[in-house]
Each structure stands twice: as structure tokens, then as C-alpha cells.
Regions:
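Phosphate-group recognition and catalysis centered on beta-loop-alpha active-site segments
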Residues: 2-9, 15-355
Length: 355
């Protein structure tokens, strides 16, 4: 079992995760404030105690560019974000791709041609990712239409679904030495705690370790059994406990929860921070609507940063920052970066990307 972090250690972890850029443009981004450890208490907001704040670009900034596209991640690097947040699935032939949905949806992707002549599985739209090979998935045009509900989204024409290793290579090519990765194992609901979870988790961990950037990567999941397996096979990786709220965790419901790796949340007073700390996780990432001052105070007391998802309006960003969250996952990284600048927070380094 991991040792629970002290408040000082929490501040250091948050500063390392946020990797803020210093005001002097000649300096490299990411030097934590020297007063972080000495000033850290659960009563202090992270943006007051060390100036760091984790700006996470959700799916590469879904509100601004075609989600999970390499172009979106590249644009996020050019903008200047702390963390690239992304989802992973496993193809039929064992390749880790960066995509959110279990099935290929017509609202996002269109068939172009079969991967091989006469492929009996063609067309592929509507099929499960787990039942398609990488070659089949690569034929899909997943950049042809603006996603409904995101009127500011720029369509990345002809986008092809990327592999996880491609995102790491992009960051390597860009020499984005301070940007971090928050990688989600997107376990299908039917596979929670099962064989599908196991194979996906092992494949994702292997890709992270092969990237040479494991020290800049956190692994997150709504299937806490995936976190537990990661803790066993890669104890060096920080783990992020995702939560969709009390009902999802099973608060007040009898018995153990499949979502939570077989624990009963009521054994931890219905508390996300208490449950996550007891399991040895490093960060809590609740839905933003469930965040309360009490949750933040409890999490910080237990040594856990709080990074809610998915926060898209300025009003919600301001409210959560005032409460003292340690970062925000957003579809609109430009909005959050602008707000951080207005508040005098140190901004993540913006990188020059190849045109």
C-alpha cells in the first residue's frame, strides 16, 4: 500500500503535475514555486500557495478542434496547456488507439473504403472498436463534420484515429519537455473488472512505459480495478480516480461497486477522497457538479489534488477555482488559459509546432 501524502508532499505533487511556466519567457516552463512545501495546508488554495494550476485539454480540446485528433493535441501544445487528456481503447489486433467511444459512431466517423478488397466486415461504422483491426480503423474519416453542441469546433478534415504512441511521438517531435499526459483506460461497461479491462490496462501501461515519458504520465479510469491492476504492474505511475458522482459510486446502496473495483463506498462514509486515499490513488477527478468545499478540504487533508471534469463555462471555471481545485479538465483550453492569465497564475509553456 502506498504511503498517504502529507500536505507538503501534496503541494509538491500538484506543482509537478501542473508544470507551470515562469513569467520570464527565456526560462523553461515547469519550475515549481520554492514556497510550495512551506506554505501548504489544506485550508490554502493551490493557486494561492504555489501559483501552479493544471490546465488539462480534454480530448485535445474537443470544443475547439476535432476531438482526440493529432492536430488537436498539436494545437493544444501551441496554445500552452499543462496536460493532454485523452482516452484509450484496444483494437482487435491489440493496438492502443486514442478514442473515446466503444463503437464507431456515424456522428463522428464515416467509412471510406475497406481495409482489404472484399473485406466482409465493411462497412465499419457502427462496429465495436474491439472488433476492428487497426488497419480497418485507419480507413475511417473521423474529421468531416462539426460535432453537435460544439459550434466553435474547427473540423480537422480527413482526421484518422491515432495510436497512443503517435501522441507521445508528437510531443517528442515538438520537444514539449514539460507537457504531461493524463491517459484514461476506457473500459467498456460489460468489461468492467473483467478480461477486457485487464488486456486494455496492460497494453496501455506497456505503451506508457515504452514512451520514455512515464514520469510525466498519470493513468485515470472510471474502472477502479484498472487502477488497482496498474498499481500492481507499474507502481511508479500516479493514479487518478475518476467519479461521476454519488449515484455512480453507489452511495447509500448496499454492497460493493463494480465501478470501484469491488469496494463499498459506504465503508468510507460515501467519500470519494477517503476511498481513493485508502486504495492508494494519487488524485481525485470528480464530475465538476459534485465538487464541494468539504470535498476539497477533505481531499487536501488526505494529500489528494482535486481536478474536476469537464468544465466548459467561465462561470463554472471561476467558481471551482475560487473553491480551490488544483486543476480543471476542459473542452475549451483557450478559455481556461485566458482566465488563468487574468488571475495572475503562471501559464503553461506554449510550444512552437511545425506548420
Amino acid at each position: 500500500m502506498r504511503t498517504v501524502l502529507t500536505a507538503a508532499a501534496t503541494a509538491a505533487l500538484i506543482a509537478a503535475m501542473a508544470s507551470p511556466a515562469v513569467a520570464n519567457s527565456k526560462d523553461e516552463a515547469g519550475t515549481p514555486s520554492s514556497n510550495a512545501a512551506g506554505a501548504a495546508t489544506s485550508a490554502l488554495k493551490v493557486n494561492e500557495r504555489n501559483g501552479s494550476f493544471d490546465l488539462q485539454s480534454h480530448r485535445g480540446g474537443r470544443g475547439e478542434w476535432t476531438e482526440e485528433s493529432l492536430a488537436a493535441f498539436e494545437n493544444s501544445l501551441a496554445l500552452g496547456v499543462t496536460t493532454l487528456e485523452l482516452d484509450t481503447h484496444l483494437t482487435e489486433d491489440g493496438k492502443v488507439i486514442v478514442w473515446h467511444d466503444d463503437t464507431i459512431q456515424a456522428a463522428k466517423c464515416a467509412d471510406t473504403a475497406p481495409a482489404t478488397a472484399g473485406d466482409p466486415e465493411f462497412p465499419y461504422v457502427g462496429d465495436r472498436v474491439a472488433e476492428l483491426s487497426l488497419a480497418q480503423i485507419k480507413t475511417l474519416n473521423c474529421g468531416f463534420v462539426q460535432l453537435p453542441g460544439y459550434p466553435e469546433q474547427d473540423v480537422i478534415e480527413g482526421n484518422r484515429i491515432a495510436e497512443l504512441k503517435d501522441v507521445y511521438q508528437l510531443v517528442r517531435d515538438t520537444k514539449a519537455a514539460k507537457v504531461r499526459f493524463n491517459v484514461e483506460t476506457k473500459v467498456e461497461s460489460s468489461q468492467i473488472g473483467g478480461a477486457g479491462m485487464d488486456s486494455l490496462t496492460r497494453a496501455v501501461v506497456a505503451e506508457i512505459q515504452a514512451s520514455g515519458m512515464a514520469e510525466r504520465t498519470t493513468l485515470q479510469s472510471f474502472d477502479w480495478s484498472s487502477l488497482n491492476l496498474t498499481k500492481e504492474i507499474a507502481p511508479e505511475l500516479p493514479l487518478v480516480a475518476l467519479s461521476s458522482g454519488d449515484a455512480w459510486m453507489g452511495v447509500g446502496q448496499p454492497g460493493a461497486s463494480r465501478n470501484l473495483g469491488g469496494i463499498d463506498i459506504d465503508d468510507y462514509d460515501g467519500s470519494l477522497p477517503k476511498a481513493a486515499a485508502a486504495q492508494g490513488y494519487d488524485v481525485v477527478s470528480p464530475t465538476f457538479r459534485s465538487v464541494t468545499p468539504a470535498m476539497i478540504a477533505e481531499a487536501h487533508e488526505l494529500g489528494l489534488p482535486v481536478i474536476p471534469w469537464t468544465v466548459n463555462t467561465i462561470a463554472d471555471m471561476e467558481r471551482l477555482m475560487d473553491l480551490g481545485v488544483d486543476g480543471i479538465i476542459t473542452d475549451y483550453p483557450t478559455r481556461l488559459r485566458t482566465l488563468m492569465a487574468e488571475r495572475g497564475l503562471k501559464l503553461p509553456k506554449a510550444y512552437e509546432v511545425k506548420g
